[in-house]
């Protein structure tokens, strides 16, 4: 409602659920600005890459950890869950990205976050509770490999969890703001969220 209300009504805090003083000048300004249009398509493109890579990494980690036959799976699960509880801090992280030449690039917003311990835990739990071992054992007896079982049996039966995590990854990346603010300085590489913030502050 505020986006199509007059600035006077917004500043006076008169807008709640219904627009007052209908005004679309802000939308006209945004869509006439080539930078914002570019940032929107760039953000969609980056979110798609992030979501696909995140699902691939999450699946590759969760599937083997869901199998009882994997030796040391408890240890590996513990190691992979550590980032969920501890963070290196902003300055060490910034220096690491600098040494890896990731600063001011699209990949600094993708690679560090494609592995999510939380999403991996959800997918691992789904595999353990919803995919019976007998189904995979039957496939092994028929000569199927681990990859064939994963792609031809497990993933087709896991559409619900894949759709859920796809939503988690996509919404999480789309709403992320702080990392772009810390690590991106080039305007053409800024996602739409950061550019809109700059636009609001009069920096564009």
Please annotate each region the language model reported:
Residues 1-204:
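A hydrophobic, multi-pass inner-membrane permease signature
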């Amino acid at each position: 409602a505020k986006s199509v209300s007059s600035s006077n009504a917004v500043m006076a805090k008169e807008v709640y659920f219904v627009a007052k003083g209908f005004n679309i000048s802000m939308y006209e300004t945004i869509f006439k600005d080539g930078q914002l249009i570019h940032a929107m398509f760039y953000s969609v493109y980056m979110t798609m890459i992030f979501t696909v890579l995140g699902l691939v990494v999450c699946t590759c980690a969760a599937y083997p950890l869901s199998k009882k036959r994997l030796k040391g799976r408890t240890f590996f699960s513990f190691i992979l869950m550590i980032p969920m509880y501890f963070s290196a801090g902003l300055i060490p992280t910034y220096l690491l990205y600098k040494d890896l030449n990731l600063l001011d690039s699209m990949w600094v917003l993708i690679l560090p976050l494609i592995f999510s311990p939380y999403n991996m835990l959800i997918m691992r739990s789904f595999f353990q509770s919803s995919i019976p071992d007998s189904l995979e054992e039957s496939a092994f007896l028929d000569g199927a490999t681990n990859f064939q079982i994963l792609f031809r049996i497990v993933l087709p039966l896991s559409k619900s969890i894949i759709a859920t995590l796809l939503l988690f990854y996509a919404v999480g990346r789309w709403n992320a703001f702080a990392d772009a603010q810390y690590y991106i300085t080039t305007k053409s590489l800024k996602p739409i969220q950061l550019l809109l913030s700059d636009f609001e502050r009069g920096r564009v």
